Amino acid sequence: MATPSAAFEALMNGVTSWNVPEDAVPCELLLIGEASFPVMVNDMGQVLIAASSYGRGRLVVVSHEDYLVEAQLTPFLLNAVGWLCSSPGAPVGVHPSLAPLAKILEGSGVEAKVEPEVKDSLGVYCIDAYNETMTEKLVKFMKRGGGLLIGGQAWDWANQGDDERVLFTFPGNLVTSVAGVYFTDNKGDTSFFKVSKKMPKIPVLVSCEDDLSEDRDELLHGISELDITNSDCFPSQLLVHGALAFPLGLDSYHGCVIAAARYGRGRVVVTGHKVLFTVGKLGPFLLNAVRWLDAGRRGKIVVQTELRTLSGLLAVGGIDTSIEPNLTSDASVYCFEPVSDVGVKELQEFVAEGGGLFVGAQAWWWAFKNPGVSPLARFPGNLLLNPFGISITSQSLNPGPFRTPKAGIRTYHFRSTLAEFQVIMGRKRGNVEKGWLAKLGPDGAAFLQIPAEEIPAYMSVHRLLRKLLSRYRLPVATRENPVINDCCRGAMLSLATGLAHSGSDLSLLVPEIEDMYSSPYLRPSESPITVEVNCNNPGTRYCWMSTGLYIPGRQIIEVSLPEAAASADLKIQIGCHTDDLTRASKLFRGPLVINRCCLDKPTKSITCLWGGLLYIIVPQSSKLGTVPVTIKGAVRAPYYKLGETTQEEWKRQIQENPGPWGELATDNIILTVPTANLRTLENPEPLLRLWDEVMQAVARLGAEPFPLRLPQRIVADVQISVGWMHAGYPIMCHLESVQELINEKLIRTKGLWGPVHELGRNQQRQEWEFPPHTTEATCNLWCVYVHETVLGIPRGRANIALWPPVREKRVRIYLGKGPNVKNWNAWTALETYLQLQEAFGWEPFIRLFTEYRNQTNLPTDNVDKMNLWVKMFSHQVQKNLAPFFEAWAWPIQKEVATSLAYLPEWEENIMKLYLLTQMPH
């Protein structure tokens, strides 16, 4: 099939003017999906002629039937018929309603004849948009390879009938909508046209809210909120970007968890996780959704085999289902989770021709497993859903109640907000609803990740954003001059990042002030730099490999590597500050400042609007060995590796390497801090040897091998997403914590509680964690262990919360209120573990963590996990600890208590003393 650009050129070849009949008032056309494109657009941006493809056939739609019998439009009509005919020489059939068209075509040498019915022998069929008897025949004709030229307007038709939902009831739309083109009841302006040399843009917004409000009301009938509080899942946020797509459940930040859409003659509902198909509280909504998708047909409801729980929920509401592994030919509705890209075209045609699709999927796990690959572009679910106007993002949402849109109250939508942003940027005034611009930025950046090449619906948005952002200089966010997120300047930061990463010309994105880390100031090396990168990864997840190079902001670099490495799933990353700040109220830096992409070619170009240290991302279990990677456009940054870098080399680096960020590395930990801080460090060796002792202790308590298979990372940043520090890969901290990381004397005297707390968080395992109770508790076991065994700082001095009088008071308050596991959290929960440690030492913990690592099929709910811990710890110390944990109000099961009764009683149980001396509560 020809590309839209080539098709546009073919349709417009030799067309020099649009001489449309003055008395024929057209209607505006609405274009959706990935195949449709505009041909004639007036000066108000309304599409009046469009084209598309469906199956093996093609479609041209004109917005008034009189255009098809206008002799002055003969050049265009001949082009249209020629482009539509896939079989050269095949005759053109013309419906009797357009009989004059047959004469126009015959007069130009085209074989055309009046045919009351469409026939397979025809190459093209021409008809008006009001025929109600040939709908299915016309769709099948086009799908098999025929060309369809159709014209009409819907505004007059709408005025004459009772049904106001033109998009879904107008006869022409029952045919053209399968290819993504709709007649609307909006009148088209004909006061001025120009013949475009290149394909015009599709407008961002065509008003059709009234057509969708009835659908929304039907889906949400009897439902005031969508509550998934106890669903035990984190759904993906949905990006609702289609003109006929609409959100159904939103959080307080306008994050969407469930959405629906019309597409062609069919319907789609998407949830951000398949687990939502099993949530009892969503039962009424699930019933509404399936009934809406069925569209009154009372047809066959097919449920994918893996989702049989949904079948049970629907049965309670009186809906019978058929459990099948795949879509069946007689299905009316198909409920499934898309796990591969198999059958995407079949499913899209199923919807276009009237089927209902109920999809549940999350993309964050896929994104975690595929760093550097956008789920908007490659996640199997999105290959199916993107044309419908709903995409599944890698951003997760917290489980909770989600509000539903209410009649008469405006609801956030990407397209309507983008249209308002366009108006504000043009006039430099105006406002939108609270929170909408803060949402527009990340939504726009996500939308720009959808591959747009030769897809006019996406290309039009790219062109619009490039035009808007090139008019103004980009704001520069700093701590001294923060940018408010929920305003145009905040939206610009996210949108600019998205544009840069989508391949737009960076010369269009000029900051208000050139900072000292951009390419005009940090002059990249004129000659390429080659670094040897260790591409072995014995770990169970991907890892970053440092290069010691920094990429200035807006600098385009060229990366070269051997042919064999280009097929090894390596990725490149610019920047280490991975925190997503899109929900921050103020921005001290851009909300997203890294860029990743696949190194799937021997030579690749990449840029990052904000600059950053350069990394090669190596997949798990890689055994590629050392790979030479050559970078053109980088500058060197300070990088010290314990055991490799000499003190003389380090002194030279901090004097000569201009990169503004540098790294201190051992085989077990890598610290990323500003170069300005590193210049105060004459000799990093003693500091890093201490850090290695810390990491050895962390590994020892966690029963991990040492040296670690992969080093942990700690990165300082001007702003992070949550807290003072937070765990993850990397651990993130504020700039104020840098001295705590790199001042050896300070570490030895005051300790290292914050960083080790986060290292402990990274050690936590769900098998022996009891969230939310122990989330901020068990990680502190590592703090106590490191401070006492490595730094020689007793627990009571390491943290005031562990001063003995404070600890005793905390236990008495807990018991005084009546011990209850609901109140057993954080420091109170830690006390339970410390009492065991003070009685039995650290060895039982180490042996226990080892045992957990070697076990499989462990329980997943808190009660069973807590009882397993009681049993395993009791066996480790050969004491019956059930009474001890019962004193802490753990939910000890009767059979567990009975099974431990043979063990000796723990006479020294400190909780006995507390209970004996506790005042009655």
UniProtKB/Swiss-Prot annotation:
Q: Where in the cell is it found?
A: Cell membrane
Q: Which UniProt keywords apply?
A: Cell membrane, Membrane, Transport
Report the GO terms under cellular component.
Answer: plasma membrane
Signal peptide residues are none
Spell out the disulfide connections. Answer: none
Give the Peptidase M60 domain ranges. 542-841
Q: Which GO terms describe its molecular function?
A: transmembrane transporter binding
Predominantly, its location class is: membrane
The protein's role, per its UniProt record: Positively regulates the plasma membrane cation channel TRPM8 activity. Involved in the recruitment of TRPM8 to the cell surface. Promotes prostate cancer cell migration inhibition in a TRPM8-dependent manner.
Instruction: Fill in the subunit field for this protein.
Output: Interacts with TRPM8 (via N-terminus and C-terminus domains); the interaction inhibits TRPM8 channel activity. Interacts with TRPV6.
Family, according to the entry, reads as follows: Belongs to the TCAF family.
Domain free text: The C-terminal region is necessary for the channel activity stimulation.
Put simply, this protein is called TRPM8 channel-associated factor 1
Taxonomic placement: Eukaryota, Metazoa, Chordata, Craniata, Vertebrata
Q: Which gene encodes it?
A: TCAF1
